[in-house]
Amino acid sequence: MDYVNRNLDDKLLCGICGKYFSDDESLREHRRQRHMTCHMCLLCNRRIPENETLREHMKNKHNIWKLFICVCCNWSFGTEIYLKCHEECMKSTGRPGLLKPLAMPMTAPAREASALNTDPQNGSDDVPHSSPSPVPMIAENSIIQASSLKMEPIESADRSSASTSTPRTLVSGTPREKIPCGFCGKDFFHEGSLREHRRRFHMTGHTCLLCNRQIPENETVRDHMKSQHNIKKVYNCLCCNWTFLNQVHLISHKTCLKQTGKPCCRPGHMEPLAIPRTASIRQFFTLKTETQSGDDDSAAGSQLFSARLSCKSCGKFFYSERSLSKHHRQIHMSGHVCVLCNHQMPKTVTVQEHMEKEHNIRLVFNCRCCNWSFATRRCLMSHVECLKKAGDARNVKPVAIPRMAADSILQSLKESEAQEYPDFSAASTTSSGPASTLKTPRMDFKKNLKICTDAVQILVGNGLFSNEQLAQTETWVMIFSNANKLFHSMNSFGEPSVSRDIPM
């Protein structure tokens, strides 16, 4: 097969249009621009349109991501070794050899395509040759021997024609085993191509089996589990891309894959957290209790999701009771409840900020054991002593308690004879009766607290007590008792003039 015919004047002739050229570069550029615009795919025997490139066709139709094209004849091959073997055959014999390309130009003569499936030594009308010169076989090529590529022996045409399917052949008459994709059914000739196809087309999205929601492509499974279900660590199977809660379930899943060839799942045992979006629950799940009749995917999914635990506050699903209790403790039970005003403080607001802003208490003391908050250090020490001796600390009234135990503790504090704060609401009572003292506005409480604080400052600021006396507990008991008297007098008659002669 001669692509270039030389005349007597040493000019290069184009075998398609008959034009003459002076050098090889001009002829190659002419063939690329004029005669190499369309190709014929030899895998599907279809003409590739001009608006679609050869690489796009191989990538979309046959999942072949890389091509090796001969610069001289514009034939396309799947590997670099076959391209070098083709070029070696062209240099030595002027013929392309026995390597069948993936695609060839549409302008190539019909005898070129027929010569690929015809034994050149048997003689042919389309391919004239004077002497039966041996065509170099693939196994005898020095390039392939150097690359240590194992080639299968050439089989006869009868065996290849007797097969029911028409697999792709790299050498004439040699079938290549196809590897089907388990998701879409496409066939591939290399495991690398199948792995790349699964990663690009079938592993882009996941379905969360906890909330039955589609995880978008811009969000990973780890981010979804961490933000929606409070699961900080997950384990992925590299084979099928399933996601599990712990490593024990992942190892059991891999063992099941090796033994049965398919992933198995039973409610409460080896259940994944998320599966690829294209995976069907009916197809991949082997439930412990099989359905009696032919149920659809929704029946299997309802049986699978029935074992999930849901949060009663927000409705989120969780894999285990431990995850549910942790979510309930961190999300719905975080923060404190103020005992003074019965206000629930959110997680972002600390007890110190609330007491300083609402009740003008600038310093609080927290118990490290139960996280209760007290107004004085003395109350905190009494609380700790009660914890050590009796194991119950409800005889000292706190100013704030954790939200998770607020209901039971507040009820017991109301019923018990605990240490009471000064009844600031009694000063603001009216003639409406004792029922009006149960609910005091917050502004009156803040006003009364400020009056009491001013009374203490008046007593301490008058210089009646020395530093040694202020260091004693009995002195402060006397100060608070006198401040209580001043508090009632200031509420009744306004701010009085305090004399230095206070009964000690």
From Swiss-Prot:
UniProt keyword annotation of Iron-sulfur present: no
Gene name of the record: pzf-1
Polar residues composition bias: residue spans: 159-172
Positions of region (Disordered): 115-136, 154-173
Name of the protein in question: Paired zinc finger protein 1
Cited function: Possible transcriptional regulator. Involved in promoting segregation of chromosomes during meiosis, perhaps acting downstream of the let-60 RAS / mpk-1 MAPK signaling pathway.
UniProt source species: Caenorhabditis elegans
Signal peptide location: none
Lineage start: Eukaryota, Metazoa, Ecdysozoa, Nematoda, Chromadorea
Family annotation (PANTHER family): ZINC FINGER PROTEIN 142
GO biological process: meiotic chromosome segregation; positive regulation of meiotic cell cycle; regulation of transcription by RNA polymerase II
